[in-house]
């Protein structure tokens, strides 16, 4: 590969990303993963720390129906604030799923996990017996 696209949240956070980057022999580019402003803070921090001029798609949180903060981090003229945002109780309550939606998404995740080979699950540290089915 010519470059590695790094998405902080799916890779396990800043510490995990740092360990991964150390092992790479190609330049990295940071990209978002549909994060709220709370999660975006970690991606922004990591991008600024490891590859400040190599970012793309960090504003995908704008695509979410709601954010976990009252004042979301949004880009302005191609720039984005590094200011940390903490989740707010009212915003989290507004974003919470009904029990029916929780059950729907849990079932979707379980169905998807059933398609993942057990050797891959093992490499993620997921015991085979913990997967439904």
Give the label of every model feature segment.
Residues 1, 20-21, 44-46:
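Short low-complexity, flexible loop/linker segments enriched in glycine and/or proline
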Residues 1-13, 29-33:
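Catalytic beta/alpha-barrel core
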Residues 2, 26, 52-54:
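Short, well-ordered coil/turn segments that N-cap beta-strands
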Residues 11-25, 39:
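Active-site-adjacent beta->alpha loops and helix N-cap segments on the catalytic face
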Residues 25-29, 43:
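Charged alpha-helix within mobile-element recombinases
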Residues 33-133:
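Flexible C-terminal active-site loop/helix
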């Amino acid at each position: 590969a010519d470059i590695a696209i790094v998405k902080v949240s799916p890779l396990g956070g800043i510490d995990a990303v740092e360990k991964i980057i150390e092992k790479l022999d190609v330049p990295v580019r940071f990209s978002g993963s549909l994060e709220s402003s709370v999660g975006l803070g970690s991606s922004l921090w990591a991008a600024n720390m490891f590859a400040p001029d190599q970012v793309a798609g960090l504003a995908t949180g704008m695509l979410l129906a709601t954010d976990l903060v009252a004042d979301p981090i949004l880009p302005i003229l191609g720039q984005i604030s590094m200011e940390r945002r903490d989740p707010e109780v009212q915003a989290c309550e507004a974003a919470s799923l009904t029990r029916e939606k929780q059950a729907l998404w849990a079932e979707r995740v379980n169905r998807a996990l059933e398609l993942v080979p057990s050797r891959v699950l093992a490499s993620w540290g997921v015991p085979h017996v913990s997967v439904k089915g």
